[in-house]
Amino acid sequence: MSDVVVIHTDGGCRPNPGPGGWGAVLRQRHHVREMCGGEPAQTSNNRMELTAPIMALEALTRPVSVHLYTDSTYVRNGITKWVLGWERNGWMTAAKQPVKNADLWRRLQSACARHEVEWFWVKGHSGVADNELADVLATRGLQEALAASVV
């Protein structure tokens, strides 16, 4: 796998829980793709933070090396530290409770399986250009979802 694809993602809700949006910026050499979407019904920040990398990875047309940046420690820690244990334990936490958002964790695992994904955490709202753009896209996704839901 060559030609690393760099992805920045973000997601959020207003209020949380409430309607939400997600955004992603994908870069490979000189190519840039911006993606966004949203959920006009009740969702959560964590579901939107998970949806963003899922949608970005699923949009890739062939297996590649990916550097994926998120400002969500929940997503980064979940996929790099916790998910294999949850899977081993039948999608139960150490406290024997069902894993929240297990449907999205499974989907993220599947999306990652096609690629070599290296995960990075970036501090949100700290001036990292593509993280800021992903935030703008997440807001756009929320706004578009809300606008579509009233028609």
UniProtKB/Swiss-Prot annotation:
GO term, biological process aspect, one: DNA replication, removal of RNA primer
GO molecular function: magnesium ion binding; nucleic acid binding; RNA-DNA hybrid ribonuclease activity
Comment on bound cofactor: Binds 1 Mg(2+) ion per subunit. May bind a second metal ion at a regulatory site, or after substrate binding.
Keywords from the named record: Cytoplasm, Endonuclease, Hydrolase, Magnesium, Metal-binding, Nuclease
EC primary class: hydrolase
GO cellular component assignments: cytoplasm
Positions bound to Mg(2+) 1: D10, E49, D71
Main location (coarse class): cytoplasm
Domain RNase H type-1, chain residue ranges per copy: 1-143
Subcellular location field: Cytoplasm
EC number: 3.1.26.4
Lineage: superkingdom: Bacteria
Pfam families (UniProt xref): RNase_H
Positions that bind Mg(2+) 2: D10, D135
Cofactor: Mg(2+)
PROSITE patterns: RNASE_H_1
Reactions this protein catalyses: Endonucleolytic cleavage to 5'-phosphomonoester
Role this protein plays: Endonuclease that specifically degrades the RNA of RNA-DNA hybrids.
Family per similarity comment: Belongs to the RNase H family.
Assembly and interaction partners: Monomer.
Protein's UniProt name: Ribonuclease H
Organism: Mycolicibacterium gilvum (strain PYR-GCK)
